[in-house]
Amino acid sequence: MAYTLDRGSYAAMFGPTVGDRVRLADTELIIEVEQDYTTYGEEVKFGGGKVIRDGMGQSQHSRQEGAVDTVITNALIVDHWGIVKADVGIKDGRICAIGKAGNPDVQPNVDIIIGPGTEAIAGEGRILTAGGIDAHIHWICPQQIEDALHSGITTMLGGGTGPAEGTNATTCTPGPWHIARMLQAAEGLPMNMGFFGKGNASRPQGLEEQLRAGACGLKLHEDWGTTPSAIDVCLSVAEKWDVQVAIHTDTLNESGFVENTTAAFKGRTIHAFHTEGAGGGHAPDIIKLCGEANVLPSSTNPTRPFTRNTLDEHLDMLMVCHHLDSRIPEDVAFAESRIRRETIAAEDILHDLGAFSMIASDSQAMGRVGEVIIRTWQTADKMKRQRGALPEERGQNDNQRVKRYIAKYTINPAITHGIAHYVGSVAVGKLADLVLWKPMFFGVKPDLVLKCGTIASAAMGDPNASIPTPQPVHYRPMFGAFGGALTHSAVNFVSQAGLDGEIAQQFGLRKTLLPVVGCRTIGKADMVHNSATPHMEVDPETYEVRADGRLLTCEPATVLPLAQRYFLF
């Protein structure tokens, strides 16, 4: 006999369905379910007296006969392509299906087969997102990986060799020897990783040897001399070898102005780091680059969002990170030239307009590695409060804004760095790098982090308790982060040249190496929900920023969500 549930009871049992709305943590952001892949009355759920039992929701199908390794049931997927309710099937470490799970022998419309070999993860009442991608990493210490993983980041791209002065300031792993050592170090770290070689050179040979050693991209940094000549050579090498170039431009305008740097690009694609400028770049108008069709602009998280404390903390950060001396007036002037209220305020609005495409950390080098996701949603919330609903929103929800902001740390850095074939969204065929959140903790504290289908991190209670939940609950590495499972739960991204040169055998690597692909054929138009190219103007005296003639300014936030309500310290 059929039984009708009211919406509240249904949501409590199986999670929200079409038309239901969910608040994201303590923000003003509201999402609404757009589609539900289930068949009402045939939902699957694990537990005592529930559906996933032998002969009911669990079939007799073996793995060879199509049963999945893991099913995530009734999850609310939040991704750039939609906000939908679905079951998710995982097999061989990849997402194999998004749809309806169950037993095809007794249930209709089943496209994810549950069998005796299937593990179940309860997605009811929880949000599922793709693992985040942080594409601006200074590899200063390996402990960054743990903090990032616990925050929901599953891929980290950047450069460095440890706490050397070169790494503290620049995201470069210079030379084949250091690249080999970092790839070997990555063998023991449960994170997808990729390493940028140093891109500052006026001849190509020193850059090409780094790509043959497995660098997944090149980084131009002003502390190594980002001259027009170095820019041109680096981009020429990248065009030949199909890798991305990231750039930190010339704050002091010693070798040219922003117009000279733009000319040196010659229309070629480039990832512009901290395009607002507080993290470095042509003062005061590097922000103009977000209007260029070939420039893929990102922010680093210390300026996200603009608050009453943003300016005060930046000066000291900058002095430390760039090896400056407060006793030298020129060093102080260099630091002060980068910190501008007007451009930081404009950055908030440019993110909301989709003119800034990505957000990353700048880990331990004027950025916080565990706060990429938090700062992204704090920015989205601040803009909702200050600017209201986006014009393209339909209904009483913020779906379009949420899709825009989640793309900034998932699909867009994946596209930018040639890894979107593997990661960056909840999509069939991609690695099962997935994050589950309770709505009340969305963006700030994940429940589970899966790496290639294996749980690698979780909020876990006392291991000596009789159940998993007693205090103290804190993040702990799970089985996917240990032993031989680790090298099957994470990958490293390298150049095709490195793969062709058999660096796995040369360096004794066990992690899967995947080549970056398609880095040179993309542009701003490929940045999902973040492809705007406004005409940018910056007043050199007042630093006022205009986009398409409109002054961009906003007040600093005095209170933020996802902050002290969730943390003791």
Swiss-Prot record:
Pfam families: Amidohydro_1, Urease_alpha. Ni(2+) 1 binds at residues 136, 138, 219, 362. It is found in: Cytoplasm. Its EC number is 3.5.1.5. It is an enzyme of class 3 (hydrolase). Carboxylation allows a single lysine to coordinate two nickel ions. One of its GO terms (molecular function) is urease activity. Keywords: Cytoplasm, Hydrolase, Metal-binding, Nickel. GO terms for cellular component: cytoplasm. SUPFAM superfamilies: Composite domain of metallo-dependent hydrolases, Metallo-dependent hydrolases. Its main location: cytoplasm. Its cofactor is Ni cation. The active site is at residue 322. The modification N6-carboxylysine is found at residue 219. Substrate binds at residue 221. It catalyses: urea + 2 H2O + H(+) = hydrogencarbonate + 2 NH4(+). Heterotrimer of UreA (gamma), UreB (beta) and UreC (alpha) subunits. Three heterotrimers associate to form the active enzyme. HAMAP family: Urease_alpha. This is Urease subunit alpha.
